[in-house]
Design a protein with these regions (language model features):
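Active-site acidic short loop of glycosyltransferases
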Residues: 4, 56-58, 81
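Active-site signature of alpha/beta-hydrolase-fold catalytic machinery across serine-
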Residues: 23, 74-78
């Protein structure tokens, strides 16, 4: 018996849970099987990709949101034969610019000083549509 569903793997960003895909799931057609994944807390993007890849379908479309885009590219690098298509959302396909690197370093500093929740809340308005709140 062949699998008639199309598999779409959804990888959220570093501060996201699988909830980030809830609204999308509500409007997805019945022939689309969603596989929502959360990035495990590992130090290396390739290690994160390896852990996630272990439990994914044989063939699938892949969507990475924010940091999940970097993880998706790492999955693509080792399992191109399994990926039918790639979607990068609110991410990029290369290294951070110097300005982005400075922003990330400042964000890490704020988070390490106890400002994590404020940092995440401050970014929500620029990342998500107001109807998603």
């Amino acid at each position: 018996m062949t699998d008639s569903k199309i598999h779409l793997v959804l990888i959220g960003g570093i501060n996201n849970s699988a909830i980030v895909w809830d609204e999308f799931a509500l409007h997805s057609p019945p022939w689309l099987e969603l596989h929502r994944r959360v990035c495990p807390a590992l130090d290396n993007v390739n290690d994160i990709a390896a852990v996630l890849l272990d439990d994914l379908p044989e063939e699938f479309y892949l969507c990475g949101f924010s940091f999940g885009g970097y993880v998706s590219l790492a999955i693509l690098a080792v399992a191109k034969h399994r990926i039918k298509g790639l979607i990068l959302a609110n991410t990029q396909d290369g290294a951070d610019s110097p300005g982005q690197t400075i922003f990330r370093q400042k964000s890490l500093q704020i988070a390490s000083e106890g400002g994590y929740e404020k940092l995440v809340a401050g970014q929500a308005d620029i990342v998500f549509h107001p109807d998603s709140a």
